[in-house]
A protein has these predicted regions:
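Compositional signal for N-terminal targeting/processing segments
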Residues: 1-624
């Protein structure tokens, strides 16, 4: 008969990764089931490729912008995206590879990352349950620890008796779950996972028995054991169908990740901190404290901070002394950090050290502490193995760049685009579409200037490729399969967030340069309504300057009427300003400067417009 072994883990814990490895080696299970996005199970071969860790599964759901609005709204689908990150010491990563190595059936059994259960969860392997547990916080403070992270390291990330690790973790996770009521999202996930486990047990029974190992977050361990015990196996593995293409676009892809991103999740999305420290602990448990102390010293010296050899030795000695004082067999993360702070910081601190609580660094944090924390975060960047499947957007974007003679560079290199050149429109379309997508490294350094008397018809851009670029482009696949479709979807999403006329005018200008003239046509009525409601003179002035530039760039768009409306509104708001200091307010000055900039374009009825502006300004000066 098949036997179930549920291994509860804390995500990204070396101790839990060791436990998973030991259980799989001892049990030789017929199946290894892992808390992870089940839609990736048929594609587990992608995770077996020789990637440079860390990597992550990126999952997304985006409501269709070009479908039936009523159908989309009625579906309840919301825009969401999230990651399931893996590093070498992730228990889930160890389970994937060790399970496959012994020939076990390996599968992810959790809901896909695009499911509504993850609508508010950007990191599947976050630490929300550890952070909100009152029982664990009370236990930490009762035993003299600043945080549950320090308590965890004290209890588990220590050399010790691995034979009792599973039992000790079980007691810890029971306290973690306690009597707390699971959320609707947790219940949906646990119900789905229980079906997957029940099916795997039935399959194992049919095949002659064996052990089925489940690796899941400790918060779910007891609930899964209880649910599976009372569950009848379904006839097939559970599956969730994605929304219809007319309602939403969903998908999951591998992306390169980094220690910085792993450590930069905030709030309930954050996982275990200081990934470089735990990587060192996984690679060399005995040498990790000294390795990380010297990594911090090296980083400080590289940033021009003076650290003597005596101070470096003192930091290591203090770490070991604190470990002995706190009853640790080897220095923990906090022992090493406290030792570094005690040895290297010579002046009184204005606030508690950052690792005493789960928070972001505050402004004014001592520069030594900033660099020490950065050293423990680490600068390792992941990379996908050659041949890893990628969304169609990646190939389409590369083809679009090549077609217009553009290429990424590793250093800032000016790309000059003469907007009157025959190929300018095509090149600008690609550049502005990349800008709409927010791909890192895409920067417009200089705008073209078509104002009268100072025509400078050259835009200057940079396309700087770094370790974030490949992953960012894959993540942009949430918006569409081609550069044109993805950027247009991003335009429509951006427009949903805009209300002010200045923002609308800026969006219209950038949409036109990206080749979406139809968007400009669609926005004319909305912009007219926004003009009529605009209460701020500076915003009306800024909109006038933008619309003037847009009109000069493409006089066929029929924007003369809008220009007249926004000019009337701006002048009316200007004359309505009162008070002796109103003319000196920064917003008023900005508005006047914007009107002046607009007048430097060749506008319809330019002489009449200039005369009206001049008269309004004179009246305002006389009234001040």
């Amino acid at each position: 008969m098949a036997r179930l072994r549920v291994v509860g883990v804390r995500h990204h814990s070396p101790a839990c990764a060791r436990l998973v490895r030991a259980v799989i080696a001892a049990e030789r299970p017929v199946a290894v089931l892992i808390e992870g996005p089940s839609d990736m199970t048929p594609r587990l071969g992608e995770l077996a490729l020789p990637h440079q860790l860390p990597v992550a599964i990126y999952s997304y759901c985006l409501p269709a912008h070009d479908g039936d609005p009523d159908a989309v709204a009625g579906s309840g689908v919301v825009a969401q995206a999230g990651w399931s990150p893996f590093c070498a010491y992730s228990p889930e990563w160890v389970a994937l590879h060790d399970g496959a190595a012994i020939g076990a059936r390996v599968a992810f059994i959790d809901l896909p990352g695009w499911h509504p259960a993850f609508a508010t969860m950007s990191n599947r392997y976050g630490d929300r349950d550890h952070q909100v547990s009152a029982a664990l916080r009370d236990a930490a403070h009762r035993h003299g620890f600043d945080s549950t992270d320090a308590l965890w390291d004290h209890l588990f990330e220590q050399p010790g008796d691995d034979a009792t690790l599973g039992a000790r973790l079980g007691a810890y996770f029971a306290a973690l779950r306690g009597e707390a009521e699971a959320s609707d999202a947790d219940r949906a996930r646990e119900d789905f996972m229980a079906d997957g486990v029940a099916w795997a047990l039935a399959e194992a029974d049919a095949g002659g028995g064996g052990t089925v190992v489940v690796v899941c977050g400790g918060f779910h361990q007891a609930a899964l054991e209880r649910l599976v015990a009372a569950r009848t196996a379904p006839p097939a593995p559970p599956r969730v169908e994605p929304p219809a293409a007319a309602i939403a676009r969903t998908g999951s892809y591998l992306v390169p990740f980094s220690f910085f991103r792993l450590d930069s999740f905030t709030g309930y999305a954050s996982g275990m901190p200081s990934p470089a420290f735990y990587q060192a602990l996984w690679d060399d448990p005995a040498g990790a404290p000294e390795t990380m102390a010297m990594a911090a010293v090296t980083r400080l010296r590289g940033r021009g901070q003076r650290v003597s050899t005596a101070d470096a030795i003192a930091a290591v000695e203090l770490s070991h002394g604190l470990a002995r004082l706190r009853g640790h067999a080897a220095p923990t993360r906090c022992d090493v950090l406290d030792g570094l702070a005690a040895a290297l910081i010579k002046e009184a601190l204005r606030a508690p050290v950052p690792w005493s609580a789960r928070t972001t660094l505050a402004r004014g944090t001592d520069p030594y502490l900033v660099e020490i924390v950065a050293a423990f975060s680490g600068d390792r960047d992941g990379a996908l193995a050659p041949g890893t499947p990628q969304p169609p957007l990646v190939a389409d974007l590369a083809a679009e760049l090549a077609a217009v003679g553009l290429a990424w560079s590793r250093t800032p290199t000016p790309i000059r685009v003469d907007i009157f050149a025959p190929d300018a429109a095509a090149r600008r379309r690609v550049l502005y579409r990349l800008r709409w997508l927010g791909v890192p490294g895409v920067q417009r350094v200089q705008r073209a200037d078509l104002r009268r008397g100072r025509t400078q018809p050259v835009e200057v851009w940079q396309l700087v490729e770094d370790d974030r670029t490949a992953g960012a482009i894959i993540e942009c696949a949430v918006w569409g399969a081609t550069l044109a479709a993805a950027a247009l979807a991003r335009v429509y999403r951006h427009l949903q967030e805009l209300t002010g006329v200045a923002e609308l005018a800026a969006a219209m200008e950038d949409a036109l340069h990206a080749g979406y003239g139809a968007v400009v046509d669609q926005l004319r009525e909305r912009a007219a309504d926004a003009i009529a409601r605009e209460p701020q003179f500076a915003a009306a002035g800024a909109a006038l300057a933008r619309l003037a530039a847009l009109h000069v760039a493409d006089p066929t768009r029929g924007l003369a009427g809008l220009l007249g409306q926004v000019l009337d509104r701006a002048l009316w708001l200007l004359e309505g300003l009162t008070g002796p200091t109103a003319a000196l307010d920064a917003a008023v000055v900005d508005g006047v400067v914007a009107i002046r900039a607009a007048l430097e374009f060749e506008l319809p009825d330019h002489a009449l417009v200039a005369e009206r502006v001049d008269a309004a300004l004179h009246r305002r000066v006389e009234a001040a």
